[in-house]
Amino acid sequence: MKRLYFFLAVLIMVSPVVVSAEEIIQKGEILTLERCVAIALRQQPSILAAQGNVDVYYAKKGQAESGYYPQIDASLGYSRFQPSTVSTGTTTVGISRISTSHSFEQYATNVTASQTIFDFWKTKTQVNIAKLNIDSSKEDLRSTEEQVILDVKQAYYAVLEAQRNLEVAGETVKQFQQHLEQAKAFYEVGTRPKFDVTNAEVDLGNARLALIRAENSLKVAKVTLNNKLGVPEAPEYEIEDNLSFVKYSIGLQEAIDKAYENRPELKSIAFKKKATENSVSLAKKGYFPVLTGNAGYSWAGHEFPEGDGWDAGLSLSIPIFNGFLTKSQVSEARANLLVLTANEETLRQSVLLEVQQSFLNLTDLEAGIPVAELTVKMAQENVEIADGRYAAGVGNPIEVTDANVGLSNARTTLNQALYGYKVARASLEKAMGIR
């Protein structure tokens, strides 16, 4: 029984911890944008993969540092020898006389140690390359995090836009429902023709279809947000509405300077470039000798233990000719450095373009929001005028339809502008390498 308990305890310790979606997000919880970002940074598989890549380079650093330490090996040997039988003559009756030698055993044990004494800093250079690759992988991890944050923000704001559009669609249905009831009342008392009723019914049907589409758009937006959070099976929850307009003030040149200073992709390729420069130096060290110290101790004999002895010495390995291998390795490292230098410039240009585009999009949307707000205000006035004219008997149903559709479109356009501005700001922040 004790063995069973011990086995179960070990199994629990080594088994991966599986966290359910309900443990991450509580049903009915109201999530802020910051909370969503925190969940994604913990749950997104892409971040786990990038972190794993960092761990890989830490392991490679450990491999490179192994050159600083002595290398110790041991071997054990056992052999049994059985000589062949040999004939030594014949007896008087013609029978061969056979003699045999005794078998014997051989034991051998060896322990050897070697230590690189001086290799013209090859090991040190390899360790430096590994450290630079670690730094580069950390920046790649940060780049992955920045992309995850942008994806979460886009999905978060898309849910808010879909919620507001659903509200618009619902209110439009209510407005056309009221208009239908009004048209029926006028028709029943004979002040309006049947056309007004059928026209109102068509408007209501179209509004209900728009409501269905808005409901589906919200569902799609929510499952998309769940995916970006890394919690696809998340329970039902709400999110805080922060879609309102807040001006973001920054100049184009300041944004460009921040991008050149902060972008993890630029830092990553800079570390890769330094690592490649070290690789050129490492390849050149193939021309130089390596001084190694070695020592050994051995036992050997027919019985264990028997004879023993030790040895110690120095060896100097001098490369004389290796078929131009070192020369080709140096050429390869230099070519890789040229490739990285060109890629670095390409990346800088891409970063500049990304900042410029994001800044211009932000500026354009900022200018459009006041216009969209004014359009909503004017559309509301049109609805009031059209409803008043129809109620007074001087308007027609087409005016009411046009006014309500115009208001719905204006409010939807405003929602799109607010969403676009938030996403443009998030894109600009990502382009600048800030959160």
Write out the residue ranges for each language-model feature.
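Bacterial Sec-pathway N-terminal export signals of envelope proteins
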Residues: 21-77, 83, 116, 233-277, ...
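Amphipathic alpha-helical coiled-coil segments
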Residues: 49-64, 144, 148-167, 178, ...
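Transmembrane beta-barrel architecture of outer-membrane proteins
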Residues: 106-108, 154, 199, 290, ...
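Periplasmic alpha-helical coiled-coil/stalk elements that build and connect Gram-negative outer-membrane
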Residues: 21, 31, 144-258, 358-361, ...
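Acidic, low-complexity, intrinsically disordered peripheral segments
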Residues: 6-7, 22-27, 33-34, 82, ...
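Sec-dependent N-terminal signal peptides
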Residues: 4-13
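A glycine-/polar-enriched beta->alpha junction
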Residues: 38-48, 55-70, 99, 103, ...
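Small/polar, glycine/serine/threonine/aspartate-rich low-complexity segments that form flexible
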Residues: 23-28, 75-115, 238-252, 281, ...
